[in-house]
Amino acid sequence: MNPNQKIITIGSVSLTIATVCSLMQIAILATTVTLHFKQHECDSPASNQVMPCEPIIIERNITEIVYLNNTTIEKEICPEVVEYRNWSKPQCQITGFAPFSKDNSIRLSAGGDIWVTREPYVSCDPGKCYQFALGQGTTLDNKHSNGTIHDRIPHRTLLMNELGVPFHLGTKQVCVAWSSSSCHDGKAWLHVCVTGDDRNATASFIYDGRLVDSIGSWSQNILRTQESECVCINGTCTVVMTDGSASGRADTRILFIKEGKIVHISPLSGSAQHIEECSCYPRYPDVRCICRDNWKGSNRPVIDINMEDYSIDSSYVCSGLVGDTPRNDDSSSNSNCRDPNNERGNPGVKGWAFDNGDDVWMGRTISKDSRSGYETFKVIGGWSTPNSKSQVNRQVIVDNNNWSGYSGIFSVEGKSCINRCFYVELIRGRPQETRVWWTSNSIVVFCGTSGTYGTGSWPDGANINFMPI
């Protein structure tokens, strides 16, 4: 082989080897890119629903940049799936209640700009709990606080803060309302906000920050709602509303709302005679409410709401240790599970209870005559046995030397069960404390516990003599 042939042969071999190497490099690059995208690939969305990506879980759309052999490849990672809540887990088994939160609003008002409020409540989204209240359009150390004992004025708004944050000047005013309810369906907040003339009020339905629907007064006599959280199951929320006499026959309706739009309205049925200010909780697949009979009974009405067919039933808590105020002494109070007991039915106070098998957990003022003190306990057979009075696990939340007020329930979903929590409104000022011209409140919050617990009292704690008049 002459020199030229040798050079040509060596060149051909080198070119072949270079070509093979280039093809291998391209194959490796293609394989790497394919594997990378498959690792983060989203399944095809069904019904325009966003599906989760694995193994990366994020809350917002971001762009991931991957560098491979100096080549930049951009691929959008799918957002985390957001689902409606269904509350299908069992109820937590508890031994009692433990302290959770206290906002000290009145004490702080002695030296700071804190809203005048009443009708507080608590509700949680899937990640965080919030406190709500109806503001009076003024701070406490402000001449506008004079006369805030009145319930319904056009300046009242629904306030919303993270639980434990008092209603300071930076607090968001969610809507215009002198009666309200709020709940989170897993995707967004629903607020039911009632305001307007006593004889022709309007309820606005605000979902995800937008007004979606409304309804006007149907009995022209103070349309009103729960003053605590509503409940949403699989995207449908339900709220109890009443229009009519506060001390006689009224027209109660149960509304079903989907993403802010009213989809159905059911009339009250069953044996309950008067319904106001219900405290509702999920009892999958349905919803149960414990309410206030402001007409005939000091035993509390129960509403069972079927979320599938919109049917309604009602009755009364069986416990002979009744939950409303005013009420008879425990030795003479009664309840037959079906009817109001006709014992000091008027006026009443918002309260709560929840079933635990055949038993019932409940809270009430310690005083049988006024809104002072607060206690909780379980009544054995209190959900199933008429006039049951066997009380266990009693706790004092506020001693009887201090004022309480409204109370209500809210539910918190844990890893394995749904816990029941409650708040107590701690009212200060008028009508009981006439040294000042205002009426406002703070709150204390407890949640169910399966552990042990001690004793104490958690009143508002403000010295009325330190407060602005």
Swiss-Prot record:
Intravirion membrane side: 1-6
Any one Gene Ontology BP term: viral budding from plasma membrane
GO cellular component terms given for this protein: host cell plasma membrane; membrane; virion membrane
Record's subunit section: Homotetramer.
Gene Ontology molecular functions: exo-alpha-sialidase activity; metal ion binding
Record text about domains: Intact N-terminus is essential for virion morphogenesis. Possesses two apical sorting signals, one in the ectodomain, which is likely to be a glycan, and the other in the transmembrane domain. The transmembrane domain also plays a role in lipid raft association.
The organism's place on the tree of life at top rank: Viruses
Similarity field: Belongs to the glycosyl hydrolase 34 family.
Gene3D superfamilies associated with the record: 2.120.10.10
Region (Hypervariable stalk region), start-end ranges: 36-88
Binding site for substrate: R118, R152, E276, E277, R292, R371
Reactions the enzyme catalyzes: Hydrolysis of alpha-(2->3)-, alpha-(2->6)-, alpha-(2->8)- glycosidic linkages of terminal sialic acid residues in oligosaccharides, glycoproteins, glycolipids, colominic acid and synthetic substrates
Pfam assignment, any one: Neur
Annotated region described as Disordered, given as residue ranges: 325-349
Primary localization class, coarse: virion
Enzyme Commission no: 3.2.1.18
Region of interest (Involved in apical transport and lipid raft association), ranges: 11-33
Record flagged with keyword tRNA processing: no
Region (Head of neuraminidase): 91-469
Post-translational modification, as annotated: N-glycosylated.
Protein's recorded name: Neuraminidase
Signal peptide residues on this chain, from the entry's feature table: none
Annotated compartments: Virion membrane; Host apical cell membrane
Residues annotated as glycosylated: N61, N69, N70, N86, N146, N200, N234, N402
Gene name per UniProt: NA
InterPro entries referenced in this protein's UniProt entry, alphabetically: Glyco_hydro_34 (IPR001860), Sialidase_Influenza_A/B (IPR033654), Sialidase_sf (IPR036278)
